[in-house]
UniProtKB/Swiss-Prot annotation:
Record protein name field: Putative integrase/recombinase y4rC
Gene Ontology biological-process annotations: DNA integration; DNA recombination; establishment of integrated proviral latency; symbiont entry into host cell; viral genome integration into host DNA
Family affiliation: Belongs to the 'phage' integrase family.
Keyword line: DNA integration, DNA recombination, DNA-binding, Plasmid, Transposable element, Viral genome integration, Virus entry into host cell
Keyword Transmembrane listed: no
Keyword DNA-binding: yes
Domain Core-binding (CB): 5-98
Record GO terms (molecular function): DNA binding
Cross-referenced Pfam families: Phage_int_SAM_1 (PF02899), Phage_integrase (PF00589)
Residues the record marks as active site: 162, 187, 259, 262, 285, 294
Tyr recombinase domain boundaries: 122-307
Amino acid sequence: MTKHASLAPLLESFFLQRLMQQRQASPHTISSYRDTFRQLLKFAERRLRKPPSRLNFEEIDAPLIVAFLDDLENRQGISVRSRNLRLTAIHSFFRYAAFEIPEHSAQIQRVLAIPSKRFTRTLVNFLTRPEVDALLAAPDRSTWSGRRDHAFLLVAVQTGLRLSEITGLKRDDLFFGTGAHLRVIGKGRKERCTPFAKSTTAVLRNWLKEPQRGDQGILFPSARGERLSVHGVQYMLNKHRQIASAMSPSLEGKRVTVHRLRHTMAMDLLQAGVDRAVIALWLGHESVETTQIYLEATLAMKEAALAKTSPYSGKSSRFRPDDNLLAFLNSL
């Protein structure tokens, strides 16, 4: 008979040993996994009427996890993509458990067999050049926060950094002179360097002359000298989008996020004829195939432009099957 295994020590060792020591996971990954398990434990507490510290491993089984994921999507309204990210964190923990408590392999395999939910992948959303220009002009550069926000937006749209990467930048991560660039630790603890345009270099040089706030050396700190929070960044973007929409009305109905600015940079590179492999390196993608979404967006733009043109006249020579079965297959 399989003995009971307490969940608490196993989950603690997963975070402390597997994620932090062995994998050296980024703070962003750790916080994402932490949030997943906080939500899962609260759900299990309501469902099983037991405090998290008293839960046994075998109680976190496949049916409970599926119910948890369904609850996130249906009751809390998270997207399918977010649901799948939660499942990825749970799968990672159960793969770790497979080595630590192999006697529970049957339960572990059932959890690992829970598939990600399929969803329709939408085309990427990005800003046009007039929209970007209006957004960059929005901050009031007569104030400290306005100068910070202008520099932040310029770096975001010119480098395509992720939210966690740009808020984690330190002043020491900037390198000027010939080949001016910034250094960033991205996904998977991989370091990459991203070059600056001359205009960005000038703005950042001036920004570094500002009195430093806080003692952490953060490049874009909050007013208290701390790292900008996710909500703080989104508040900043919403404020400047609202101001910029007076100059560029098309911004009125758009949601501006750091991720959308990242998409904007990628589209600029692609439309300038930059190879997809270079774009993948620039953005820190593990695979060139990830940049396919930008190519698909470009094709969609071309198709929309084609639809507005006057088509040349000509007779269609498309084959018309006279067989009912072939007609059925062609209709699928």
